[in-house]
Amino acid sequence: FNEVIFVKDISMQELKNTATQMRMKVIDMIYKAQSGHPGGSLSAADFVTACYFKYMNLDPKNPRWEDRDRMVLSKGHVCPIQYACLATVGFFPESVLDTLRKEGSMLQGHPSMNRCPGIDISTGSLGQGLACAAGMALAGKLDHKDYKVFCVVGDGEAQEGEIWEAANTAHKYGLDNLIVFVDNNNLQLDGTCD
């Protein structure tokens, strides 16, 4: 791949343009797969893009680097936006995006840490990701590491008790290295999040 340079001083307009490019990649991937969850991927694009292109410390050549920042998609079904970002920053060739949800592909409908470089935790069951992220953040504190853990939670899954238990755990242990984004798109499987 091309050498990746992380532009930490990227402007807001450049981030917006990059998020638009990531959305276009998501639409293309899901269209080619004829399967997927476009809504949640598109609504999470701004903050996932900002994390990967401005805030996260990563090394695409060393995906398991011990001091890297971590990303947890608690709502794992929105992984197409994560895949688009990972490919663009150099974790794997962008041509792999065309294999989304294909048999044998490393890009499945939920992220798999055993298949895809750059995925820090396999997620799928809604409500569990924040607990995993809190555990990673606590491990970082106990190991005296400086990495941050970014977690994307859906507003629908925020109705799960495990989310609130994880939030209480984060507070109890002072996990200031845990950054949580709630994707408040007001949608869930069976309607709105009223």
For each feature predicted by the language model, list its residue ranges.
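A short, structure-level motif marking secondary-structure boundaries and short turns
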Residues: S11-M12, K32-A33, D67-R68, C151-V152, ...
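N-terminal capping segment at the start of a domain
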Residues: A19-S35, D183-N184
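Short, Lys/Arg-enriched N-terminal segments with co-localized hydrophobic residues
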Residues: F1-V7
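Cofactor-binding active-site loop characterized by glycine-rich and histidine/acidic residues
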Residues: V26-M29, S41-K172
